Regions:
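Canonical positions in the second alpha-helix
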Residues: 59, 92-93
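Amphipathic alpha-helical repeat scaffolds of TPR domains
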Residues: 14-20, 30-41, 68
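Structural signature of tandem alpha-helical TPR/SEL1-like repeats
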Residues: 14-17, 47-53, 80-92, 114-121
Length: 121
């Protein structure tokens, strides 16, 4: 099991490095939204939020209607303390996927941080 985890981590690291190389060299590329989600999660897990935000912008340029990518964008914006922008991203995600409870939870958390307690409920 530990070996399988290590292998997955190495594959993810390789994917992130490939992505960074393509961005650095301004190479046109396309990834499935799930690959972008994995790349962005790696940046979030490693506290590289600005790089994660860059990755999410590229991902959303290719997958405009992915509520999961918009939620990840909101998570990064929250980590960067850009709460108003996070709410905009969450609002877009909600319009695409109105039943996703993660959107409600994150929206409530951001509204509490902003002191909008009545709106957080």
């Amino acid at each position: 099991m530990a070996e399988e985890f290590k292998k997955r981590q190495e594959e993810l690291q390789k994917l992130v490095l490939e992505f960074e190389l393509q961005v650095k060299n301004n190479i046109d590329f396309y990834y499935d939204s799930e690959y972008y989600e994995r790349i962005v999660k790696w940046y979030i897990d490693n506290h590289k939020f600005k790089l994660g935000l860059r990755a999410i912008e590229i991902a959303l340029s290719q997958h405009k209607f992915s509520s999961d990518l918009l939620i990840q964008k909101a998570n990064i914006l929250i980590a960067l303390q850009k709460f108003s922008k996070a709410l905009i991203s969450l609002d877009k995600a909600h319009s695409l996927n109105p039943k996703d409870e993660n959107i409600f939870i994150l929206t409530g958390q951001v509204k509490i941080i902003l002191g909008h307690y009545d709106d957080a409920i």
